[in-house]
Amino acid sequence: MFFAARVAAPFVFELFCRQDWRAWTRPELLFIDRDLVCLFLRHRHIMRSAHANDARARRDRKDSKDRKGLVFVPSVPFVLSVLSVLSVLSLLLLSSTIMKYSSIKRFLLLATIVLIVTPALPAWAGGNDKLANIPRSEYSARRQKLLAQIKDGIVVMVGAREEDFGEVGRFRQRNDFMYLTGVQTPAAYLIFVPAGVIPGKPQHETVFIPPRNPGHEQWTGFQIGPGAEGEQFFGLQEVAPSTAFKERLSELLARPAAEGKPPTKIYTVMPSWKGGEISRESRFVEMLQQSHPKNPIVDVSGIIAPLRLIKSQSEIEMLQKAVDVSIEGHREIMAAIKPGAYEYEAQAALEAPWTRLGSERPGYPSIVGSGINGTILHYNENRKRIEAGELVVVDAAAEYSYYTADITRTYPASGKFTPRQREVYQLVLEAQRAAEKAFVPGKSSLLDLQRAAKKVMENSPLRDKKGNTLDKSFIHGLGHWIGMDVHDVGSYMSLPVGSVFTIEPGIYLPDEGFGVRIEDDYLVTDKGLVKMSAKMPSEAAEIERMMLSQRPAPPQR
C-alpha cells in the first residue's frame, strides 16, 4: 500500500489539487519517483532469488542429518510472496482509480511497459550496466587477459573483510580483487580456472560470497547474495556461497593428482609488508600452504600489475573525475590558509568539497604541512598553528570509484611569497616543466625525466645555507604511477601509452624552515603527455592572486 500511495501521489496532486484531469497523459509523472520503482523491481528480483535459494536448500537437506540451520529458510520466500501479493493488490487498486480518468489504451500501454521492464531488473537495481562506474564487460575482459597468461595453475584470491577497517570503518575491497571482479561484498573469495589446467574442466570463473543474512543487513545494508542473483548482478559465470570455497578448492586440486599429473600451481596475491602487520593475505597464504602443501604457490601480482598499469577509457574517466574533485578542494583550502589558523582547519576546508562532489574518501592521508612541517615528506599530523610568513605544503587528493589523484601545491600563509620563497618556488616549477618537455613518446622513462628536472636545479645559481646546489635538497623520486593506489603498481622501465603518473619535484630546506613541492598528474598518449590537473594553477603569481582574492578586504578608514 505504501508503494501504491507513493506512485499515486503525483497523479492525485495533479487531478485534485490542480484540477488537471488529463494528468495521466503527462509522461514525466511516471518518473517522479524512479528510486521507488527500482526498489519495487529489486524486491521482485530478491523474491525470485529467495525461491531459487530455497529450492537449493531443500535439495541439500535430503543429504543432511542436521536440519537446524535450515528451519527458517522456507519462511523467506513465503514472506516475500505475501509482500508481492500486497504489492499486486495495491497496484490493482491504483489501476482501478486511474481507469476512471484514463482510456483503456493508455492503461494497457502502461501494463506492457511494466512487463517488459521488470525482467531487466539487474541493470535497474545496479543503476546501469556498470559496477563502480566500470562496465561489467570490462571486468570480464580483464579476467580473460589474466587467464590467457596462466597455463599451469589456477587463480585463488581472498577479498577484504569488514573487520579489516575496524569496528565501524568504511569497507573498501582489495584492489586486485576489485580490478578483476567489481565485487564489493566483504569476505569474498575467487577461483579462476584457465581452460585445460584441470582435467575435464573448461575455463571457469567463480566468486564466493557470504549467503544473505537479513539480520546482518539490518546493521550494514543490503548485500547481493550468491546464486542467480549474484551472477546477474556481477556478470559472473558463477557466484557461490563462501562456505563452499574450501571444498571446491580441494576438489579442483585433487583432480590432477588422481590422474597422476603434477600438482597444480596456485596463483595468488602474496602478502606485502606493512609495518609488521599480519595481513589477511598472510593468513590466507598460510592456510593454502597448510591445506595444500604439495601445490606450489606463485605470486600473481606480477601478472596483474602490467594489466593495471595501462588504463582503459573508463579508468581514465575515473582518474580525471578524481583529479577534478581534488582541485575543488585545493581551491577551497586557499581561503582557509591564513596566519592563526590550524593545519587541521585547512584540512577540513580541503576535504569537504570532495565529499560533496561524490568522493568516497581521501586517496591517502592529507598532508597539510606549514613551516618546518613542509620539509617532512609524509607529514600528516596536521595539528600545528599556521604562522605569518610561512609556506604550507598541501599534498592531498580525493579517491573516486577506487581511483585516486595525487596533487601537491605550496601556498604562502600570508598570501604572498617572500623573495627567497618565490625564487625557490620558481626553481621547482621550472624543474617540473623541464621534466614535461623531456618526455619523448615511446622512448622516455621516469628516470629520464628525473635527470632533466635535477639538471635544472643543479645549474641554478641558488644555494642552500651550506653553499650546496639545490638539487641536493631534492631528496625523493620525481614521480610514480597512480590508479587504484596512490603509488600504483607497475614497472618504471618505460612510460607506456595509457599509463598515468605524477611529476613532483621538491626542494626542502629545514635550516630555512620551509619546503616547496609541486605535483601534477599526467596521462601518457602516443602524441605526448596530457596534464590531467592543468586546471589547478601553479604559477606563483596566480597562486597569490587566488589566495588574496578569497580573503576579506581590509576595513576602510
Residue ranges and their predicted role:
Residues 56, 65-67, 99-108, 123-557:
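Active-site neighborhoods and metal-handling regions in enzymes and metal-associated proteins
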